[in-house]
């Protein structure tokens, strides 16, 4: 994925317009997440013929129920959690699985529920450390070893994001890293139980796509071409229910689609 933001490059938009004209390109199909489609929306505002396709493992684009890549990432994370259960039980320790999710906790929520996690921490709901310790101790009292799934963007109440360093990419994002290790240290200090962290990182972004993602991407592609033929510029193809529809790029990127509190409360029935 490119981390270059043409909107902050001098003459970036003009350069894009010139290159498209020089190459005889009639339409641009932008495939990506909030940054890619955010740029696509601005390009559309400047009169460039653009159609968007939602591709991000974070599933955080508005206007679509699912983005392709999300189901594959959840499957990879779930398989990892399944494996972590074995070593957690054999060594009687706390296992923390840190997954991607800067602003939205969809991967943690879905993989945590599917993998039978005993606690899930997401960016949308700042957590109380004492509550997390309660989940851990409750699990050990039942003679089981706890598994916690944590989004990289999760943070404690009255706390700050755990970052790798202070540098920003061209879209203004900090490099997140370390919430899992930090939490493991807190658990060991407060409960005396051994805690280990597995950071899945970029393994979530590759590999063989699931059947769901293959079908979804195929349907998105077909409908993106139809939108081009219709000259329905400035739109993103989206999945709503079982239908592929078109929504304005500005709508898709205006507000991030985050995990509703009700979904997190639903999952919390299995915590501890």
Segment roles from a protein language model:
Residues 160-163, 207-215, 247-254:
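Short glycine/threonine-rich loop-to-helix capping motif typified by GTGT followed
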Residues 46-83:
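Glycine/threonine-rich beta-strand-loop-alpha-helix active-site module
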Residues 1-30, 35, 68-80, 272:
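Glycine-rich oxoanion-binding loops at beta->alpha junctions
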Residues 165-177, 203-221, 225-229, 267-269:
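Catalytic, metal-anchored helix/loop core of enzyme active sites in primary metabolism
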Residues 3-5, 33-36, 48, 53-60, ...:
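Short, ordered loop/turn segments at secondary-structure junctions
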Residues 182, 235-272:
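Phosphate-binding loop/pocket of nucleotide- and phosphate-handling active sites
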Residues 27-32, 40-42, 70-91, 95-194:
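Accessory alpha-helical/coil subdomains and C-terminal extensions
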């Amino acid at each position: 994925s490119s981390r270059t933001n043409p909107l902050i490059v001098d003459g970036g938009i003009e350069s894009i317009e010139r290159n498209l004209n020089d190459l005889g390109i009639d339409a641009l199909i932008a495939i990506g997440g909030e940054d890619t489609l955010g740029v696509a929306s601005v390009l559309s505002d400047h009169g460039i013929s653009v159609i968007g396709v939602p591709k991000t493992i974070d599933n955080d684009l508005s206007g679509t129920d699912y983005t392709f890549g999300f189901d594959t990432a959840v499957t990879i994370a779930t398989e990892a959690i399944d494996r972590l259960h074995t070593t957690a039980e054999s060594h009687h320790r706390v296992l923390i699985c840190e997954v991607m999710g800067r602003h939205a906790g969809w991967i943690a929520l879905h993989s945590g529920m599917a993998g039978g996690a005993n606690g899930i921490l997401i960016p949308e709901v700042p957590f109380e450390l004492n509550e997390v310790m309660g989940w851990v101790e409750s699990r050990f009292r039942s003679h089981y070893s706890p598994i916690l799934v944590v989004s990289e963007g999760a943070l404690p109440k009255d706390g700050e994001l755990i970052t790798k360093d202070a540098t920003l990419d061209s879209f203004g994002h900090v490099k997140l890293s370390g919430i899992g290790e930090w939490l493991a240290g807190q658990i060991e200090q407060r409960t005396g139980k051994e805690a280990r962290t597995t950071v899945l990182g970029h393994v979530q972004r590759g590999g063989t796509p699931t059947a769901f993602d293959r079908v979804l991407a195929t349907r998105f592609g077909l409908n993106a071409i139809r939108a081009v033929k219709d000259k329905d510029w400035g739109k993103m193809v989206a999945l709503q229910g079982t239908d592929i529809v078109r929504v304005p790029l500005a709508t898709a990127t205006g507000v991030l689609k985050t995990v509703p509190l009700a979904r997190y409360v639903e999952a919390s029935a299995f915590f501890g």
